[in-house]
């Protein structure tokens, strides 16, 4: 049985292709001048034998062969001795209306070993229908657009470096033109993706995270869904932007929690570090340690202590009661307690051994070694200068016992207690004036003295005792003393 049976002519819309008037002679061989490669079939399964072309490469260019290759399974065949297209069972001859007549922008130059169909381009002044010729006919005049159905798509994804290397080399004598793949695959312009190089492992890797994929489309979708920031995903409180709305919702929950509130003002924040920075910037002077010698402020006691070391050791602390001076504040405190304790006393309103109003000589100032402060024992007032504490005690805590007996040195907080104390000395026949140095052995002499010597300065006289006052208000405040007694 003949391996290549005769085929009946197929009538088309272009009968001139197969008419004798075309002026092209046909070969009367086993094919009867008609290609038997099922060129009009939708699915052609026969492919040429690759060994046939390998043998042809070794032959001389002057040798010719009219023998057609044997077809096995799947690629195109070409005759290297003639510059025209050799029909192949894989090639589909397309009508000139299948593609635009304009040249594709994606035409590339490849070497002889590429798998794309080869054709010799010749400029024609007029577009004419595609004519099919035999292997021994004259070179083809019309450009034939062809594409392989099982063309490997991966071969076209060459890197930019490889394409540059090929263009730098001297172009081969035979050029092959590749049809735009987007036209063959019906890919629209919106679906085209930019060419990216995969890494050494053949994966497309996300530059913002650890995501990687074998396909660039997956990477593109990942970038849009995960890393595309929009103005709608911005926090209204802190103005921070997020890639997804889900992350924004999670972040917004932080602002709903109980914020850190500044105790000095109405400032609020959900971050503790921000609150600390706010206090340091805004309320820095509200909680400072300061040096009373040079009026320099510090934010911590340790910084203040270091500042004290900077003061010259020749700086002296002076006693306010005498001419004693020292460069050690603790030594000054000890001096005041030991030498001037009588000037730093307090009145005890409690009965002490049955005697009311007796003074107890207690120190009102102590020295805190840890914090380097002089502290008032009565109210807790503190200062780094001993003179400040002494002044405080003299003003705030000594005005309540101004009456001191000249005979025994006892002091009293009120004139009534002082007068009662003076009566204790009457048994001895001595009467003392509480306003001056006058003394007498008769009570009547004392009353006359008060009326003449102190009536001008103290016009308001108490009817129950010998007390006199400079104004009526002091007298009124004195009268309740007699009501309690």
Swiss-Prot record:
Any Gene Ontology biological process: negative regulation by host of viral transcription
Annotated source species: Bos taurus
Chain segments annotated as coiled-coil in the UniProt record: none
Family as reported in the entry's similarity comment: Belongs to the krueppel C2H2-type zinc-finger protein family.
Keyword Ubl conjugation applies: yes
Cross-link (Glycyl lysine isopeptide (Lys-Gly) (interchain with G-Cter in SUMO2)): 76, 177, 181, 226
Stretch list, region Disordered: 1-20
Zinc finger boundaries on the chain: C2H2-type: 204-227, 233-255, 260-283, 289-311, 374-397, 403-425, 431-454, 460-482
Function field: Binds DNA and may function as a transcriptional repressor.
Annotated Gene Ontology cellular component terms: nucleoplasm; nucleus
Residue numbers of Phosphoserine PTMs: 60, 88
Composition-biased stretches (Basic residues): 1-14
Subunit comment: Interacts with CTNNA2.
Protein name: Zinc finger protein 639
Keywords carried by this UniProt record: DNA-binding, Isopeptide bond, Metal-binding, Nucleus, Phosphoprotein, Repeat, Repressor, Transcription, Transcription regulation, Ubl conjugation, Zinc, Zinc-finger
Interaction with CTNNA2: region residues: 371-455
Compartment(s): Nucleus
Domain of life: Eukaryota
